Design a protein with these regions (language model features):
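Phosphate- and divalent-cation-binding pockets in alpha/beta enzyme and binding domains
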Residues: 58, 112-114, 242
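Contiguous mid-protein beta-loop-alpha structural module that forms a pocket-lining wall or clamp
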Residues: 78-150
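Basic, Lys/Arg-rich alpha-helical nucleic-acid-recognition elements, primarily the DNA-binding modules
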Residues: 10-11, 21-86, 94
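Intrinsically disordered, low-complexity, positively biased terminal segments
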Residues: 1-5, 12-17, 37, 50, ...
Length: 283
């Protein structure tokens, strides 16, 4: 039998689309434009492993700055699992993020393995599933994010994330067929949210808000952009009981969970104002 060498390289965008297809096959239901948006966050932060000429493994290790990175897309094609290829690309990814506090959202089946690499549990994120439609709220303070100065949106996003993600946020709020809305309190941005098309339905994320009232208004505004026949998904930090209650109020059901884990200290973020996580893949 041919002895094929295993090689790891930085992905190009075409290869990131391959990893997105693997994520779809794993049941992770990525957004239709996720690969293009994620790539903007750190073009060097996506690794792919080839066995000969065949791509068989992936990992994303987005380095937002010199102190914080996010790990995701850790996938080995099923027929090649248990042969050490995953560990090789895992180690290459962590080497790229050396010196960073590294975060991930780990599926239940892998959480014990992540602990062996010094990841520590911070809290659970819960994916809720519901349906679109409903009346748009009567709110004169709603704004379209792409019409605001991008610096204003990035400044608000940065309060909820351990690092600035300028290129990513710009791509995220301008991706095709999404709706990116905010709420202004006077001249100040007080909430932001995005709903984007996925292979199945739509995902809301992020949903950040200064108050529960703003979060609910923005949730309803985003939900109303989608047909009542479409599924919608919202990924909620379980520690935010008000966010959980919002999902339950609108008859959303629990469909999936992850563990948010960090190698370093848990960042001091306003989780009580995080009503929806941006993405399980890159934070």
């Amino acid at each position: 039998m041919e002895n094929r060498a295993f090689k790891i390289k930085v992905m190009d965008l075409t290869e990131l689309e391959i990893a997105a297809k693997w994520a779809l096959q794993e049941g992770w239901n990525p957004g239709l434009s996720d690969a293009q948006c994620y790539y903007q966050a750190d073009p060097n932060g996506f690794l792919i492993g080839y066995l000969g000429d065949e791509p068989i493994a992936s990992i994303s290790v987005v380095k937002y700055d010199d102190s914080f990175g996010f790990l995701g897309f850790y996938i080995v094609k099923p027929e090649y699992r248990g042969q050490g290829y995953g560990m090789q690309i895992w180690q290459a990814g962590l080497q790229y993020l050396a010196g960073c506090n590294v975060a991930l959202d780990g599926v239940v089946a892998q959480q014990e393995n992540y602990k062996k690499s010094d990841f520590k549990l911070a809290y659970r994120n819960i994916r809720y599933e519901g349906v679109g439609g409903g009346e748009a709220p009567d709110c004169s303070n709603l704004v379209v994010l792409e019409r605001l100065p991008i610096e204003e949106v990035i400044a608000y996003d940065s309060a909820f994330f351990p690092a600035k993600r300028v290129a990513f946020v710009n791509a995220w709020i301008n991706q095709p067929d999404c709706y990116a809305l905010g709420i202004k309190q006077g001249d100040i941005l007080a909430a932001i949210g995005v709903i984007r098309p996925c292979h199945v339905g739509y995902k809301i994320g992020p949903l950040y808000a200064d108050s529960a009232e703003h979060a609910e208004t923005l949730f309803l505004a985003l939900r109303s952009k989608v047909s009542a026949t479409e599924a919608i998904y919202l990924d909620v930090p379980e520690v935010n009981a008000v966010a959980v209650a919002l999902a339950q109020k609108y008859k959303m059901s629990l469909s999936f969970e992850t563990a948010r884990m960090y190698t370093g200290e848990r960042p001091d973020l306003p989780l009580m104002q995080v009503f929806g996580v941006t993405s399980f893949e890159i934070g």
